[in-house]
């Protein structure tokens, strides 16, 4: 049970104490090492009565978003460290560019159990098991209201693009859907055995 972050992690001052005190809350690991919070964490999980350790890693891309440390080098270094403790490693790559996320998936193939992309709010349909045994999807998508523009009020979003001026965007409320993936991981090898994309309820 944890929540990963991204480019809005530090948007609210309340995040300071939450990230410092709650190990369930992660922020991108490729921020500077002096930034408060955790970029990865190992959590106990129970599967069929057995207790296992699942590591969750959070990194953020640099294309169109931020000039952070290299997510490729950061994730690789963390994975090497975590392998000494567990081979069940789940990576959330928060990124804007699909090419960057796909390249990252190839780079981490065989090094981690899963690479799941986030950020764009739009689910992709390219879920797969890569040759090295890593489950991958470019973007898991958004859980929220689809009667809008990536979760925001559609009228305000249209006005912002139409007039090219700022408009306050409230959260959309209608047509709520769940976007998710379920990844099956072999607890012995750490390789993914399956990945299933979820989008419910679907569009009519």
Per-region residue spans from a language model:
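Acidic, metal/ion-coordinating pockets
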Residues: 1-204
């Amino acid at each position: 049970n944890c929540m990963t972050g991204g480019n809005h992690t530090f948007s609210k001052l309340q995040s300071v104490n939450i990230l410092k005190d709650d190990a369930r809350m992660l922020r991108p690991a490729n921020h500077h090492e002096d930034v408060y919070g955790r970029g990865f964490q190992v959590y106990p999980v129970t599967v069929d009565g057995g207790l296992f350790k699942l590591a969750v890693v959070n990194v953020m891309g640099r294309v169109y978003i931020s000039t952070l440390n290299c997510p490729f080098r950061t994730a690789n270094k963390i994975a090497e460290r975590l392998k000494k403790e567990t081979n069940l490693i789940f990576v959330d790559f928060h990124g804007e560019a699909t090419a960057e996320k796909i390249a990252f998936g190839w780079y981490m193939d065989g090094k981690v159990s899963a690479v799941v992309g986030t950020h764009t709010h739009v689910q992709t349909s390219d879920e797969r098991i890569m040759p090295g045994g890593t489950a991958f999807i470019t973007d898991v998508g958004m859980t929220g209201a689809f009667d809008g523009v990536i979760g925001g009020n559609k009228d305000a979003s249209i006005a912002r693009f139409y007039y090219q001026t700022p408009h306050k965007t409230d959260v959309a409320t209608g047509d709520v859907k769940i976007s998710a993936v379920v990844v099956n991981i072999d607890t012995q090898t750490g390789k993914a055995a399956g990945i299933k994309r979820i989008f419910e309820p679907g569009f009519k």
